[in-house]
């Protein structure tokens, strides 16, 4: 008699529908799925790499003979800006790499506190004090 109330319940027979609905709800609340964002990130990285390859070609073509001095031909500010961004990017990458390498060690490479000093009562110092006395 206690199991008769489950006869009218269909939630367990349609659990996959509720599971799919719940998954869609949380995906909408939290944003896109991680797999899609990884794919988008790889496409963006591919586009950046292609743009980096095309920048020197484009600049070499604009600095060549017959380059106009108009708005489309004056790329000096753009060249300076790109160079500064590249330097900043390399510096940031180097800093992040240093932080990632230092993280397992538990200290920063620039932190002088990680250098171990001999305690004041080191055996070498005690021997020098006893030999004088």
UniProtKB/Swiss-Prot annotation:
Signal peptide: none
Region (Disordered): 58-77, 89-133
Biased composition (Low complexity): 58-73
Basic and acidic residues bias: start-end ranges: 89-102
Lineage top rank: taxon: Eukaryota
Keyword terms, alphabetized: Elongation factor, Protein biosynthesis
Gene Ontology molecular-function annotations: translation elongation factor activity
Family stated for the protein in its record: Belongs to the EF-1-beta/EF-1-delta family.
Protein name: Putative elongation factor 1-delta-like protein
């Amino acid at each position: 008699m206690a199991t008769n109330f489950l006869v009218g319940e269909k939630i367990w027979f349609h659990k996959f529908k509720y599971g799919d609905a719940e998954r869609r709800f949380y995906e909408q609340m939290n944003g896109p799925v991680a797999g899609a964002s990884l794919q988008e990130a790889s496409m963006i990285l591919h586009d950046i790499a292609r743009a980096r390859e095309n920048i020197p070609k484009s600049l070499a073509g604009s600095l060549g003979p017959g380059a106009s001095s108009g708005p489309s031909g004056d790329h000096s500010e753009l060249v300076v800006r790109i160079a500064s961004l590249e330097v900043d990017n390399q510096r940031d990458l180097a800093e992040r790499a240093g932080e990632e390498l230092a993280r397992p060690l538990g200290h920063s490479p620039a932190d002088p506190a990680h250098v171990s000093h001999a305690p004041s009562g080191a055996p070498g110092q005690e021997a020098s004090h006893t030999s004088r006395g």
